[in-house]
Design a protein with these regions (language model features):
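NAD(P)H-binding glycine-rich loop region in Rossmannoid oxidoreductase-like domains
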Residues: 57-99
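Rossmann-fold scaffold of SDR-type NAD(P)-dependent oxidoreductases
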Residues: 13, 74-80, 120, 222
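Catalytic helix-loop patch of NAD(P)-dependent Rossmann-fold dehydrogenases
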Residues: 98, 102-103, 125-163, 168-170
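N-terminal Rossmann-fold cofactor-binding loop
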Residues: 36-45, 58-59, 82
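NAD(P)-dependent short-chain dehydrogenase/reductase
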Residues: 143, 155-203, 209-210
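C-terminal amphipathic/interface module of NAD(P)-dependent oxidoreductases
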Residues: 243-248, 252-290
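N-terminal Rossmann NAD(P)H-binding glycine-rich loop of SDR-like oxidoreductase domains
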Residues: 2, 7-30
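Mid/C-terminal beta-alpha module of Rossmann-like enzyme folds, strongest
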Residues: 207-210, 214-262
Length: 290
């Protein structure tokens, strides 16, 4: 018998991160049974982490993770955990590959043992950004440790799906991402030749929730919006968030890591919102939950 969404048990790894906490909030609002795993004790006091639904666990300890999965027996595990590009230089190379590469492959193995579906979040940074409009079958060619480690972590066996994308969104206690950094500035440069096709964390959460009720069981898929320059994106955020930040155009950085998301849309019939709608929705949602 197919489980209704009200009874599906979801375990989110990296629940305190930019995507993880947004996904946790959104899935809880849709009445899924959600637990999160993170390492940050101070996050546990957040209002939306209630009723012991947040577990404090070091994801480097695979044996403890396996015991947790065995105890909770989730229907889905969604891996939002990872050492991010902005912080990769702070970590030993072995740890980067342990978390970004070994962990998702181990979870893929465990999905067979414990009979859960596994959704892993990858990145457009598996590509060098010289071409743009990358399709799923384009060979990954990143030159840095972050991109290489994420490419090695992409899984696609039975009941394992990798979603390759890029995100912007609000964070809990940090400002590692573009959005939180930008909102604290008075004057910035916006790169007119730096393109990407990411999603807001709220939009990606909506996509993942829809995917939980689709018959898509394996593979690597690009999740992509319409390509936009970093300059255009900052201008849009500036307007919608009613800021008065001075944005100076620059052509100094030239890179195009945009993804082609047509295959995912064809397979699932899930359509990605426009950038304007995504930013408006993100702003409204952040005001609502806070």
């Amino acid at each position: 018998m197919k489980l209704s969404r009200y009874k599906k048990k979801i375990l989110i790894l990296g629940a305190a991160g930019m995507l993880g906490h947004q996904l946790y909030i959104f899935l809880k609002s849709k009445n899924y049974l959600v637990k999160g795993i993170c390492r940050k004790n101070k996050i546990i006091s957040k209002n939306f982490f209630k009723n012991n639904n947040l577990l404090n666990l070091d994801l480097e300890k695979f044996d403890l993770l396996e015991n947790t999965i065995n105890k909770y027996r989730p229907d889905y595990i969604i891996n939002c955990a990872g050492i991010i590009k902005q912080k990769a230089h702070q970590y030993d190379k072995n740890k980067i590959y342990l978390i970004n590469s070994c962990l998702p492959n181990y979870l893929s193995f465990l999905s067979k043992k414990f009979k859960f579906k596994f959704i892993h979040i990858s990145t457009d940074c598996v590509y060098d950004g010289k071409k743009g409009n990358y399709k799923e079958d384009n060979i990954t060619n990143s030159k840095d440790e972050y991109g290489l480690s994420k490419a090695l972590g992409e899984v696609y066996s039975d009941n394992c799906i990798t979603l390759r994308t890029s995100i912007i969104g609000h964070e809990l206690n940090q400002s590692n991402g573009l959005l939180e950094w930008f909102l604290k500035q008075k004057k910035v440069y916006g790169f007119k030749k730096a393109f990407f096709s990411g999603l807001t964390t709220l939009e990606l959460s909506k996509v993942i929730e829809k995917l939980l009720n689709k018959d898509l069981n394996k593979g690597i898929y690009n999740i992509a919006s319409k390509k936009i320059s970093k300059y255009e994106l900052l201008v849009l955020i500036n307007q919608i968030y009613d800021k008065n930040i001075s944005i100076l155009s620059s052509k100094k950085l030239q890179i195009d890591r945009s993804l082609n998301g047509k295959l995912f849309e064809k397979k699932t019939n899930i359509k990605i919102s426009s950038w304007k709608k995504m930013i408006v929705d993100m702003n409204k949602y952040e005001l609502l939950v806070n």
